[in-house]
Every structure is written in C-alpha cells, then in structure tokens.
C-alpha cells in the first residue's frame, strides 16, 4: 500500500511538472508572437511614414523596386509559400525565425536614419533591443523543442548574410532607405507567420491554416 502511494505521488509530481513546463512554453510562444507582431506593425508604420514624405515622382520610381529582387535574408533557406510553411515542423520554423531575426541585428541599427524625418514612428533605436529580446526567446523555445538533444541543424553553422548588405549596394540614399524598410517589413511578416504556425503545431488538433 505504501509503495502504491509513493508511485502515485511520483506520477502526480511528474504530471504537475509537465503541466508547468507546457504552461511556460505556451507563455514564451505567446510572448514571441506578440513581440514579432509589434515589430511587423512597426515596420509597416515606418515604411508608410517614409512613403508619405516622398514626392509623387519619387514614390512612382520607388514603387518599381517592390516586389524586391534581393534582401539580406534571401540567402536564408525558408519556406516559399503557404503549403510549404504549413508542412514545416515546429522546430524548423523556429530555427528559420531565429536566423531571420539574427540577420537583422546589425542592419536594424541603420533604421533610425531611414526614418529620421518621421515623428510618428516612435524610437527606431529600440528595434535592435526588441530584436535581441525576441532572439533570446526563440532560442529558449528551440532548446525546449530539442529537449536535451544536440542541435544538428547544419544551417546554424552557416555564416550570416553580409552585415553591411544594405549599405554597399551602390544605390541612392532614397533607394537604400526604401529597400531597408521594405525588407525589414517583409522579414518581420515572415517571422510572424512562422511563429504563429509553430505555436499552432503545439496542438495536434489545431487547424494551422494560413
């Protein structure tokens, strides 16, 4: 009888620990989604404010740039459409999100110059800090998915895209700024999508359609 009570106690403790871990992971996922959603909204606001300050002819010329031919993150392997995204594992989506966020740590420092004339966008200098916080959160989620297993992802050992990509393209300052903002918005939209689907992957019964 005593042995049965001990076993029951062990099972109950294990269930409570697992429940607590699942609850903490859900909290981390929710925070990550909220953070990247804020960054995506901020990116959209930044580029809208930038475009509002352009002359009609400047706006017409820059409209030819998008859809973008090249972004700093284009060398990072990622799902190319909704179907591929939905078929990707939670771990894969987290790893790609981590790489995308990491690729913006240096370029984000130049965003303040791109929107220096905007008074409604907030403080762009805080973006680098927000990206760093999000990167840490995603890293914790990746470790949780690995559950003590070694990280065997080959992409983690690859060098990041060129840090000064947006500063060495030989374009005018106007085009550089527009490309920087457009690529930032594009990548934050990607990460938001990947994190939402990854979060949905945690529930096998969920419909993770985009």
Swiss-Prot record:
Domain of life: Eukaryota
Gene Ontology MF terms in the entry: growth hormone activity; growth hormone receptor binding; metal ion binding
Xref: Gene3D superfamilies: 1.20.1250.10
Zinc among keywords: yes
Binding site for Zn(2+): 38, 192
GO CC aspect terms: extracellular space
Main location: secreted
CDD domains attached to this UniProt entry: somatotropin_like (cd10285)
Pfam family, any one: Hormone_1
Disulfide feature: 71-183, 200-208
Signal peptide residue numbers: 1-23
UniProt keyword terms in alphabetical order: Disulfide bond, Hormone, Metal-binding, Secreted, Signal, Zinc
Subcellular localization, as worded in the UniProt entry: Secreted
GO process terms (BP): animal organ development; growth hormone receptor signaling pathway; positive regulation of growth; positive regulation of receptor signaling pathway via JAK-STAT; response to nutrient levels
Protein family: Belongs to the somatotropin/prolactin family.
Role of this protein: Growth hormone plays an important role in growth control.
Protein name: Somatotropin
Source organism of this protein record: Ctenopharyngodon idella (Grass carp)
